[in-house]
Each structure stands twice: as structure tokens, then as C-alpha cells.
């Protein structure tokens, strides 16, 4: 019965869909997903019990569900690849390359220099991270002689 409840959990499905889009590397973290979905359900039930409307309770539950997940390394890398390497790596290459880049030690070390909070994308530090990631990706492509579309356009 518990397994069925987890499989049919609205908040679990909502979180899994979100992770699939923004944190594909975390989709299989079942312990995290289960705990967070349960916390969101508790927040929702508590809000309803306190007299909040269903839409208000949904907002409160979503805050719990997505806490710490608003800034995505995956989304940042896809953005860098799409914006800075549009000619060299046309769609769908950015989405396919990003999971590999997330595992790259040089890329990981760039991210490790920054405190990546939910609102990091709105800070001045974001531009520094973006620039550093762009340079790191250029180096990865050059050092490893990776093929790109229109390689002659690489700077």
C-alpha cells in the first residue's frame, strides 16, 4: 500500500517532472524525492487545516517541494551552450552534452567556487560563473580536440 501511495503521490510526480527538466542527475535519488514529496504533502495538509484555500496551500507546498532547487547547474550549462556555442553545438546537442559536462572535473571545480543558492541567478556572481563556464567549455573543446559543427568559427 505504501508503495502505491508513493507512486501515485501528486507531489512526488510533480517533483520528479521538475527534476527531469532541471536536475536530470537527481531524478533517481528516491530517498530525497520521497522525503521532499512527503514534506510538501504535510505542508499542504497543514495549510488546509489552518484554513488556507487549496490554491494557497498548493503555493505553500510548492515552496517546500522546490526549496533549494531554483538554481540549476544543468539549466546554467544548457544556457551557456545555447547562447555561446549556438553555431558550434546546435540543438539538441546542448541538452545531450550537458550531463557529460556536469561530470567533468573542470566544470565541477568552476561551480564549486560559488555558493549556489536559490537566488544565485539574480546575483552579480552569476555573470562571473557564466563567463568562467564559457571559458572552461572552450578549453575542454580545444584541449580534447572535440568536433563541433562549423569548427572554424571557434574563437
Question: What are these model-derived regions, one by one?
Answer:
Residues 1-155:
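C-terminal alpha-helical interaction appendages
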Amino acid at each position: 500500500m505504501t508503495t502505491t501511495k508513493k507512486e501515485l503521490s501528486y507531489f512526488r510526480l510533480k517533483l520528479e517532472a521538475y527534476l527531469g527538466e532541471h536536475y536530470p542527475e537527481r531524478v533517481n535519488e528516491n530517498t530525497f524525492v520521497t522525503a521532499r514529496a512527503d514534506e510538501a504533502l504535510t505542508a499542504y495538509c497543514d495549510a488546509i487545516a489552518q484554513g488556507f484555500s487549496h490554491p494557497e496551500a498548493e503555493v505553500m507546498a510548492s515552496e517546500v517541494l522546490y526549496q533549494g532547487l531554483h538554481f540549476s547547474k544543468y539549466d546554467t550549462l544548457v544556457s551557456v551552450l545555447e547562447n555561446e556555442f549556438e553555431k558550434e553545438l546546435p540543438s539538441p546537442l546542448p541538452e545531450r552534452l550537458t550531463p557529460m559536462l556536469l561530470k567533468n572535473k573542470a566544470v565541477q571545480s568552476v561551480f564549486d567556487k560559488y555558493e549556489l543558492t536559490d537566488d544565485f541567478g539574480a546575483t552579480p556572481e552569476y555573470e562571473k560563473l557564466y563567463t568562467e563556464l564559457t571559458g572552461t567549455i572552450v578549453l575542454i573543446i580545444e584541449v580534447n580536440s572535440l568536433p563541433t559543427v562549423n569548427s572554424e568559427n571557434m574563437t
